[in-house]
Design a protein with these regions (language model features):
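Conserved, well-folded catalytic cores of nucleic-acid-processing
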Residues: 100-104, 123, 169, 220, ...
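N-terminal pre-Walker A segment at the start of P-loop NTPase domains
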Residues: 3-37
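Acidic, gly/ser/pro-rich intrinsically disordered tails
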Residues: 2-3, 284
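Conserved GTP-binding G-domain of TRAFAC-class P-loop NTPases and closely related GTPase folds
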Residues: 185-284
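Conserved P-loop
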Residues: 33, 38-131
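Short, well-ordered beta-strand core segments
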Residues: 68-70, 176, 224-226
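Hydrophobic/aromatic ligand-binding patch that stacks against planar heteroaromatic rings
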Residues: 60-62, 168, 216-217
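P-loop NTPase motor core
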Residues: 119-213
Length: 284
């Protein structure tokens, strides 16, 4: 007895195949969630970056943040009447102390200042060299020993972890502030001659700024404040006046930004405590 051939499969709906129907799980509709709508300006902790040349007053300005606690990596706060931890000498210690602050913020601490992010990056680099190996499992003696760009990618990952630690503090209602040194950086200009611009002294990435810790920090921050000495031009020559300004908006000469202000402040006209109010930086 000859068996008859099985009937052909039923045609799938237009635009779909029978096999796709079997393979594709049924889409689920998420449960409805009620919105929690608020209006007006919300009081929230802030992410702040202050950068400028050594000795210009970065630590002094940060010291007037409410309830400031310095994690002092280069003894920049020793002459200031602030709470500080000046014993951190490694990346592991720095991350561990931030974890302790997240777990149990000390009474009275409302702002955490890392002095400086430039030194913190060096600690991260030392940590990567000491703990990571190449793809062949070999130890290296310098960040370049990992191969082109690979070592700095590890440092970028470590520093991103530090920013995540600081985000946890912000979620608890604490302001966080990174101080940094300055560096002049060549900026390509397709419309004319290239020029130099002041930026925070952090790793800038490759030629296309991929893997840039500097750009990552800028994008992360609510405020990037540039402190600089004023220069006046007389008879075609620049002359320093000894006065200082705080820049909150970006210009060809520097990077800066603020979510709440767009002005230039005379650092010597106001006391440091009043500057935070003039910048409209909301502190919980």
């Amino acid at each position: 007895m000859t068996k008859s051939a099985p009937p052909p499969p039923k045609p799938a709906p237009s635009g779909r195949s029978a096999s796709a129907d079997k393979a594709s799980p049924r889409a689920t509709v998420p449960d409805a969630q009620a919105l929690s709508i608020t209006t007006g300006v919300a009081s929230a902790a802030q992410r702040i970056v202050i950068y400028g040349t050594g000795g210009i007053g970065k630590s002094t300005l940060a010291a007037y943040l409410p309830g400031a606690l310095f994690i002092d990596l280069e003894q920049g706060s020793l002459s200031l009447p602030v709470a500080r931890d000046a014993t951190t000498t490694s990346w592991k210690e720095l991350r561990g102390k931030l974890a302790a602050l997240v777990a149990s913020p000390p009474d009275g601490v409302r702002s955490v200042v890392i002095d400086t992010a430039t030194v913190a990056e060096e600690l991260a680099k030392e940590h990567v060299i000491a703990t990571r190996t190449t793809e062949k499992g070999q130890r290296v003696e310098s960040i370049e020993g990992f191969g082109w760009g690979k070592g700095w990618q590890f440092v970028y990952e470590e520093f991103t972890g530090l920013l995540a630690d600081l985000d946890r503090l912000v979620a608890l209602g604490l302001n966080v502030c990174l101080l940094a040194h300055e560096v002049d950086t060549p900026v390509p200009n397709p419309a004319g001659e290239d020029f130099l611009r002041w930026e925070p002294h952090l790793y800038a990435g490759d030629k296309k700024r991929r893997g840039s810790i500097r750009d990552r920090v800028k994008n992360w921050a609510d405020h990037v404040l540039f402190l600089a000495y004023d220069v006046h031009v007389k008879d075609g020559k620049g002359q320093g006046s000894g006065t200082r300004s705080i820049y909150t908006t970006e210009l060809p000469t520097h990077i800066a930004k603020s979510r709440t202000a767009s002005l230039v402040l005379d650092f010597d006209l106001f006391d440091a405590a009043a500057i935070w109010h003039h910048l409209n930086i909301i502190t919980p």
